[in-house]
Structures are given as structure tokens and as C-alpha cells.
Amino acid sequence: MKGTESHGHSTGRAAKLHDSAGNKIGATAVIAGGGFMTDLLKNGSADGVDRRGFLRCMAWAGAGMVWTVTGGIPTSKLLGQSGGNEGFQFVQISDSHIGFNKPANADVNATLQIAIDKINALPQAPDFLIHTGDLTHLAKPAEFDTLGQLLQGARTKQVHYVPGEHDNATDDGKEYLARYGKGAKGTGWYSFDHQGVHFAGLVNSAALDGMGKLGAEQLAWMKDDLRGRSASTPIVLFAHLPLWTVYPDWGWGTSDSEEALGYVKRFGSVTVLNGHIHQTMQKVEGNLRFHTAMSTAFPQPAPGSAPSAGPMKAPAGKLRGVLGITQVEFVARPQHLAIVDATLE
């Protein structure tokens, strides 16, 4: 199993989060130059995220800035600056939707290739890629074939996958599991270790019930998988749908994520990576850092800004600016993960 993402260049500035009346409502965020922030904390939003800590949504920003959190304090650095001589990097890509050919993007193969080119242009090849689901649009064998052919061109050959709901669209995930499920449990969940970091690929897209769902079997597996691990072990969870409630009206969350997150709260460093919503949103809650990635295929509206979620046609010439990849760097001393989002421009 396996996945991917990459980077770009931008300047940034620190900014306070305010509501529409100018009242301060959040922590200091780092905003990429050339983007704008969609603030879900505005007017004390009803989904509860305002009560759970630092949140920023950069639906159109395409950040080119690394952010890190140490002791709950976000700090930033320009993309390309090294975090140290020790550690490793990996790249997240998401929602490639191979097979999609509607006006929002008539050539998703080409935009995925641009993402791969960005990954290949990184100064240091990432150790591996993570793909957080919706590899394909209709789970057809030919779509999986095309994805595989494109990813063969990535300089980093190891890719970890988790499925999205589109990968289960026509056959309950049989084709996906036949290709990527070797050694996985259930509908495709698994874990692995890399240089002292424990990764768990979770499946919350196989049994949708209004929102994502992990289910009792997977939760029991997760609890057992984490049992006995030192609290100092850095943990990375990755799944397709967000493991925090972004916008329940559109099903952007996981109904039983609270139990899953309860299993990792004893660990000192937990990073949670997701896709599905096709835009970058980040939240820090204690020792948990949540991050959703841009798609390589098409954007979706910011939560609540349209009648419903779905493919959104970008203004002419702007598509690459709302698609992107995510580069993650693990720094061994002090232990933390730095995350860089970059558009395909």
C-alpha cells in the first residue's frame, strides 16, 4: 500500500483570526501570500470546531509555507528550507479521480502528471508517497491501470494507499483490494513503521452513513495495533475522509472518529492526514494535528459556500492554483512533523 504530494514557493505573513465584526476569535495563523483564508470560526460556527482549538482553512490559498507546531505554537519557514540533517520526508497526494472528464477538469491525467513532476523536482527524493484515496473516479480496471502507469514515473517508487468512496463505487472495493490490499485487514486498513514513526492507514469510506465510518472491527484492530507502543512514538494516521468534523451537512467527517482519536491521545505527537474535501484545512487540538489535502483533479467549494459539495470549475487559467500536493518532513531532534502544501502552478 502507499501515497504522495509536493511543494512550491510563496511568502507568508502571520495573521490573527477575526470574525466579520473584527473580533479576535482564534490563534495566530500563517497565511500564504496570494491566497485568502476562509474562516470557519466566523460567527461561532455551529459544528463545534471553534471550541476545539486552532483551525485554519485555505480553500484557495495553495500555501508554499512549512508550518510546524511545538508545544502548541505554530511556527513557519519558507518551502525549501531544511528542518535539519536527520529525519525523512514523504509526500501526500489525494483525490486524483482518474477517469473524471467533466468541465471542472477535462484532463485529470495531465494534472496528476504535473503533481508527479513537482515531486520529482524536489531537492531530496521523498522516502515514499501516501495517496489518501479516490485514486479513481469509477473504480474501473482501466482507471487503476492509468494511475499505476502515471505513478511509475515518480522518482519515489514506494506508494502507500487508502481507498476513497469512489474506489468502492462499482464493486465494493474488490478491484482496489486485489491491487493494493495485500497484507491489509478488512476493507484495506494496515499499519507500518518507518524510522521510528508509526503509520496507520485507515478506511472510513467503505461504509458511508451520512459521514465516514471506521466500524467496530477496524476500531478494535486500531486499539490493538497501538497497544504497547511507547507514548513517545510519533504517530501518523491517514484516511480518505477527515477524522474530525469539518462540515457535517456535507458528510465531511467520520461518525466514530472520537473513539479512534481517543486511542492516540496518550502519544506526544500525532498527525492526521486526509483528503476528500479537495482543499487544505488544518487544526491543532492538543497533541493532535489535523491536515486535509488538496486534490490533483478538481476543487470543491468551501464548506457551506454552495448548495452542496461537488466538482467546482475554476476560473479560466486558475485550475492549477487550486490543485496541489503536500510534503511532510519528519525532524528527529526535536521530534516534529513539518507540513508544506503547494499548488500545481
Model-derived features with residue positions:
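N-terminal secretory signal peptides
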Residues: 1-50
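N-terminal twin-arginine translocation
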Residues: 36-43, 47-53, 64-83
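Sec-dependent signal peptide hydrophobic core
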Residues: 58-63
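Extended active-site neighborhood of metal-dependent phosphoesterases/phosphodiesterases
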Residues: 82, 140-234, 256-271, 283-294, ...
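Active-site neighborhood of phospho(di)ester-bond hydrolases with catalytic His/Asp-centered motifs
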Residues: 93-94, 129-133, 160-165, 238-239, ...
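Short acidic, glycine-rich surface-loop motifs adjacent to enzyme active sites
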Residues: 231-246
